[in-house]
Amino acid sequence: MFAHEFNHFPPSLSNSGEMNYPSNKASLIHEILTDCHNAPDEPSEFDPTSAVLIDGGRLLHQFPPRPLMTFRQYAEMLSKGPISLYLQHHQRMDIVFDTYIDGSLNAATRQGRGKGLRQRVAAETKCPAKWSQFLKDTRNKKELNIFLAQQLTTYSYPEGRQFFATCEEKVLSNTSFTMADSDQEGADTRLMLHAKHCLSEGLNRIKILIDDTDVIVIALGIFHKLQSSYHFDDIVIEFGINKNHRSVSLKALANSLGPSRCLAIPLLHTLSGSESTSALKGIGKKKAYEALKAYKESEAILGDYFSNAFKTLNEGDSAFKTIQRLVILMYARTSILESIDDLRMELYFQRSQNIELIPPTSNALYLHTLRCIYQAGVWSLCLLPFQNRPSPCEYGWQKTNHTSMYQPVWITKGEAIKECREFVKCSCKSEICTRCKCKNAILRCTLLCSCKCDDRVSFD
């Protein structure tokens, strides 16, 4: 019975059928930084032949418009303020915005972030007072990103400096230098594409300013590939503001972790919860990372599925058995079990029969792993302008007739209440039951019962 979920969605992965997003997905980075003492917190100063890349979302949140500003005045403020300041110290600056595509997988995962205030963007229209609410509406952000990219590339900057801004699939510039179009939707992956372009142009030190620590996870996964193709001093990633500001040398961090663990971290991150994958309830990033360190054999499997984007995984594969074992160690560090379904029964009795605190079934975990492999595959191909991604429907997602949005396929095995004739257990203290819930329901006792009946039904 424990090979079946108790409902049509797994409580360990979902909230009443909705994705259970992690409350603090950045904590994985903090665990990694704590573990790697050789990674300096503050890098040395950049030389004048460096580049700075910034996530457009960070720019918009860090530098909101002043009261009563029009959108044109806001663009001028950004140009004369932070952009000009960055270009005084760097040869090149790139702003990378998200692209918003209706009906995409990213569009489905953005639904959980709340709805904002709709306002059209035009040069002489005043910016809204409730800026954070304005930025919650993807239609607003799409129009704003296009407007800013077009405006910012028309202004004058220090002589000889290069400025690039993404505008949907295109990349605009203030110079004759060009970059290839790209169908990458997220700024987190497209920043890596721009970093690669900087390195190919001979810039040897890059600073990346981010709003989302997923960028560090992605960068670790592809760092050694970049290092084998280009000669450069370092890539430094900055995140957080004020007292939470951190500056990380990617080179020092990647060399401290080693190639094998760097490749494993992206898929580990998706397994323990990311923007498009559920978190396991009760299992934070710390437990996930500790399990990876304890079970070193899993590094090669996770790394292989990141390196070989969208690689096929079947439920009976040895690779999935390794992933099962890794998740088992997230829940019970000393367990010797190989089957997560066996662990479900063991933990069910240990944890006061709270089904949210036991792991998903092997079937639900398999479908969750497919969704994780898909997300890791998108990240893995971040150095390609056009990714040629397969359909998410091949990786644990579906589109139903009543919605154009992707929904997770939670289980393909019947739920326990349908597969088992009755979910009844008795609390008898005697050796043999005579009058109890099971007898009244004309059922044999099971291993869930407290009695010691000789004819109890097992769940094999």
Spans of model-derived segments:
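Noncatalytic, typically N-terminal accessory segments of nucleic acid-processing enzymes
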Residues: 1-460
